């Protein structure tokens, strides 16, 4: 029985990892073993940060909405505003509210007035 060396498969696998590690510092971009470790760690960071990005944007939207609500009425807080929106039956998500607060303050103030009226 003849010996199978599988050199092409190994070379292709190595080349794939080295290609993914392109631009990394020093041996991390050329040495297969360190490149494998670097690519694995980079993939871990990428997966973690895709999840974190969603949390970070939601926190940013909440901060922007809170700031705009306090400009509208110093007594109103973010939680009271959201409660007023739900009582008024206004279903607008936080992303849209934050965008309105930044780019169209008049429209946001109209929504805030409706929320305040629903609370009273």
From Swiss-Prot:
InterPro entries per the UniProt record, alphabetical: Ribosomal_bL20, RIBOSOMAL_L20_CS, Ribosomal_protein_bL20_C
Record keywords: Ribonucleoprotein, Ribosomal protein, RNA-binding, rRNA-binding
GO terms for biological process, alphabetical: ribosomal large subunit assembly; translation
Alphabetical list of CDD domains matching this protein: Ribosomal_L20
NCBIfam families: rplT_bact
Membership in a protein family: Belongs to the bacterial ribosomal protein bL20 family.
Protein name: Large ribosomal subunit protein bL20
Name of the gene this protein is made from: rplT
